[in-house]
Amino acid sequence: MTLSADVAGAEKGPAKGGRRRPPRTPKGRQLDTAAVQEVQALLTDKPRRRDLLIEHLHLVQDHYGHLSAAHLAALAAEMKMALTEVYEVATFYSHFDVVKDGNPPPPVTVRVCDSLSCAMAGAEKLLKDLPGKLGQNVRVVHAPCMGACDHAPVCAVGHVQTFKATPESVAAAVKSNPHAHAWDKHTGLAAYQKAGGYTLLKDCLSGKRSRDDVIKIVSDAGLRGLGGAGFPTGRKWSLVRAEPAPRMFAVNADEGEPGTFKDRFYLERDPHRFLEGMLIAAWVVEAPETYIYIRDEYPEIRLMLLDEIERIETAGLSPHTKLHLRRGAGAYICGEESAMIESIEGKRGLPRPRPPYVAQVGLFGRPTLEQNVETLYWIRDIVEKGAEWVTAQGRHERKGFRSFSVSGRVKNPGVKLAPAGVTVRELIEEFSGGMADGHTFTGYLPGGASGGILPESMADLPLDFGTLEKYGCFVGSHAVVILSDKDDMKAVALNLMKFFEDESCGQCTPCRVGTEKAARLMENGPWNQELLIELSAAMRDASICGLGQAASNPLTCVLKYFPDELTKPLRTW
């Protein structure tokens, strides 16, 4: 047999030593020169720090409508990160479209909210009807709560939301090719200052007010964290202040609990009241840097805050803390305090084991104060008017006031500022115009998806921190969804379980597997009550964070309070 010269040479091998080494060739994905140049053009002179990874991914996603493999590799090279790290982060967040090269998604994406309030208003029918109405160049996908439950059903064309959506209104929105613009229906800096705004902050910075005095007023008023946990605010400030400097400050504007939209309500109307409270809190704990983490579903508010923060800085109102605005990317889990910190640092939003708590080891490894938007919104009023202004309000032996996000089967849904301890029956009749026509009140969610479900027979319980726990429920973020005789309680619990299944970060097995198994058991045939109870207990007792621990609350409440529903066929909307 005659060999070619190349093969013959190869067979001779090296004269001495081991086997011949193959010629060196590059391994792995090779950088695309054009993609590198495109990424560089988007980043310009922005820092290539790890904590800015999600911000940079947004730049590419916003410009091209997706994240290609070539752009991810180019971004990894620019930031001197492993491609696997960039890929893991990009694929963790639902608002990033990671695609193969040459396989981009349709140019327009329509997201249909199918969380409970929107499902009750016809989201399922929208998901069925829209693809045929919009055509092949539009992608229709389901999405979690968009923070506009009082306008259900809600769709987002790109990043612009359509309220009380119909196939016709969504088609018109697609045709108009909308783009998000800065929100402009709020009280601006000049008007806020004219009404006395930032006077308290100036008094704090000038020494007219002491940190201890401000903490005492806030503590005496009984202000608690209004994002869901309800931890006493003054105590939290004192705990963080006791930790060594430098301390950090992180603001949670990522309200993603289904049924919750009160932070959006206040930010759209009076953002500087929130910003002044935030700057006072930063002064109290002496935080040289403050990070605001806002959900991606609120693009108009994000753009508005960028403008207002620039005005604050120009006016010299924030000399004590550097302000950063960070953008979420569609992950409910980032509402959990440590997951949010991971996301601000440019990582996947995975909750951290505790201890240590974020007040001890938080953002960038430093002691960190973390607060919700509404908590900070009330700081100015409480300190200026005194603790008595708060404690003089309340009902049923509770003190203070609460902002309730009310949606579902009422005539007038919306944010209702009501006395702490108000009952859901009072909330419906006095604040929400009564039940919607043709609906009979049968049950309610007192605290969003996580807070459980209670029957109409328990509608006279005070709604406040600590009043519902013995019934297997809690008020959490005060998101109240009203249910009627038109709603199947099994379908309600299934909708919420599917939400948790979708939003589980996947880090721990009890939550990842438990939510999936529970959803399958709940949607297929008669409920296996014994197995569902056992599964719920495992999720509650062994999950790392509050998502898995609370995911079974609606399920267990239906088993406990609505036994007559269990024998009926599943009836969706």
Regions found by a protein language model. Give the residues of each.
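Ferredoxin-type iron-sulfur electron-transfer modules in oxidoreductases and energy-metabolism complexes
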Residues: 16-110, 114-146, 150-180, 199-220, ...
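Accessory "access/gating" subregions that flank catalytic or transport cores
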Residues: 204-243, 391, 405, 417-418, ...
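Short loop-to-beta-strand transition segments
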Residues: 236, 290, 433-448
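Hydrophobic alpha-helical positions that pack around
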Residues: 302-420, 432
